[in-house]
């Protein structure tokens, strides 16, 4: 041991001693464990000690301290490990034993919420060692080390052994294991060397009776650890040294420590883990961890509070016929019909789940679910609060979300024609309401103000078609929050009183969640007050500054995003959300921002589809699990027309998959949101995906993002000698992409002959991309001859199928040169003007330009008046004939806006309008950010 200088003893077990030591060779601190001197002469214990070291050395996991070295030469038997600063789980538990009052810091450290992630890490480590065939056999708080920097490691592998190993039998034979009387087992918290392997207090009953160890014995020990974490007490209430029968009743955690507010099912998990009969325990660590997942993920536990029978009047406070128009005046369908109205006798909590099934026929004329504030409900003002209206027409289910009589969200979806009954689930929390139909999310709304109502109302015509209504309550809702008082003032629109109490709570709980939550709600209160009473909404921004850099830092940016959203500053809203998501990616409040993104997606689909694609991209990038498979299909339908109008989707005939890099690139292209392009480029390069790299270059170039284009060009040049793409991608080389990049640069520098020579060395797809990137600028700069020359050079050697892709450019040049005969022939032959010609297609707009060249303005307006989408791109281009369209552009996505400006410019040139008119559109196009050919 000359290499090591012992500093001090830091731990002692049944077989070994652990010292803090200085490693002279490496000049570092290590933990050195050696066999106890009084046991060093025992050959069997010496063998077990070395087995411990070798087992630990073979296991590689964050929850296991790695072994640096093992020494068994001569009398010295020891091994070394990294020294981890921290404390044992036992010392943390011991710090709160028999204490009636805990400090805020200690209360937080020993809360159920804080302990569960620690326990899950312990379980993950044990799950790993079980997968390697190892049993620990001495799991206890003493052997769990909590590092100062979040480490959770299992130590002391002296009792560990491989399952089914010969040593199990040898221990029973050679160690003369003691026979135990099951009626009178004396528990101990210390491992007994040479007698029994493990610590009796944490050993399963069958182990104390001499039964061979198994995974179930480790699960039992973990159950005892979980029990102590939940209760801060050991399950056996006994005086030290008293003998105890293991058949004695063990109180469930929820009864042992009622003040700890332990969810009943979590209590049951602990009891199942420490069941006397091994068959009654969890079958594996994996099953135990799965049972804990809802609590680790923050999912609420629901217990049924009441069951309401639709036809049983005793379940309802009010049960009367009513006119629908009084409750849902905004509905277009049959508002004058009479319906049954029922108001629940029972009040519902802040977190409530409503579940029922209903027949399709019962909602043919519609049915409503209301969440009403009690005060208004008592006065008979049933139009206040939130309402959901369900109706089925022609196999299509429509759900409307209504607030205070105003429809704020609506969604329709086709149902299975044979389906006669469907299940509806509504989850309501302080600030969130979610509607699920057949387990698929249908509507999500977040208010950020706890005012969703606490009485349930039902409006329906056909009572026979509705099942009983199950009202479940979240366990978390049983706690009365200190925020309830200001929340109540807020729900009554008593903003000043609410603000006073929010400030008091903020100042009373510094550094705690209650404090930053109160400040966040204070900011939302002031924002709502300004919005209702009139004023500058940006005044509310300073309220969220208070959260800067604190425990609730992400909420600063969520609050500011709300201000910008209500102020109509979409770009600033996105900046705030992105900053929080990037800077605080591991913060506990980030799921709240992810929920907000999800809400904004659905909200913008209803109000501003131009914004929806941005939120779709952000969710795909940050929280793709938030979107269900059924929602994927819906979103793919929404973007179908844009997909058909996207060049790199036309070139690649493979279907666009929603959860794919190509979808992320597609959304980046349409939204002009280029933040994720570098990562997409890195990902495509790593996969050697030639087509993806080409698509990314195209998107960066055609979007005008010169900086990204050149950045990718430099990155590609650095690996041009190293990479050859696989044969499955036609063995395309990086050199072809480099020719493309240099060719595009030559086009930008107006060196057209050089560009042609470089692009000649590239495949048709890259030539097409270069052509598309160049054609807009050629028309804007009125350098058509150069474009025609490049177009002809690409056109001549191509196949018939490839020529279809560049036909549009040829027609454009004919229209520009006022060659009506050639333009008409190509248009009529390939894109006949009939009802099947889609308004979103390029050919539809080119027909409008052709009609403009004929001088028939009436025909032009008649052509564009066919558009079904009044504020779509084609319809807006038609509007520019008689007036400006700039006020309508906000309804369009970024790329749609650019193309609308260009095509309006092109149409006005064809109409032979004055330069003053078409120049406005040209300048507006050029002024849009990231124009590549500036």
UniProtKB/Swiss-Prot annotation:
EC number: 2.7.11.1
Keyword Ribosomal protein: no
Entry comment on modification after translation: Autophosphorylated on serine and threonine residues.
Catalytic activity reported: L-seryl-[protein] + ATP = O-phospho-L-seryl-[protein] + ADP + H(+); L-threonyl-[protein] + ATP = O-phospho-L-threonyl-[protein] + ADP + H(+)
Keywords, in A-Z order: ATP-binding, Kinase, Nucleotide-binding, Phosphoprotein, Serine/threonine-protein kinase, Transferase
Gene3D superfamilies: Phosphorylase Kinase, domain 1, Tetratricopeptide repeat domain, Transferase(Phosphotransferase) domain 1
Domain Protein kinase positions: 4-296
Residues that hold ATP according to the record: 10-18, 33
List of catalytic residues: 138
PANTHER family attached to this UniProt entry: MITOGEN-ACTIVATED PROTEIN KINASE KINASE KINASE 20-RELATED (PTHR43289), SERINE_THREONINE-PROTEIN KINASE YBDM-RELATED (PTHR43289:SF34)
Name of the featured protein: Serine/threonine-protein kinase PknD
Species per Swiss-Prot/TrEMBL record: Chlamydia trachomatis serovar A (strain ATCC VR-571B / DSM 19440 / HAR-13)
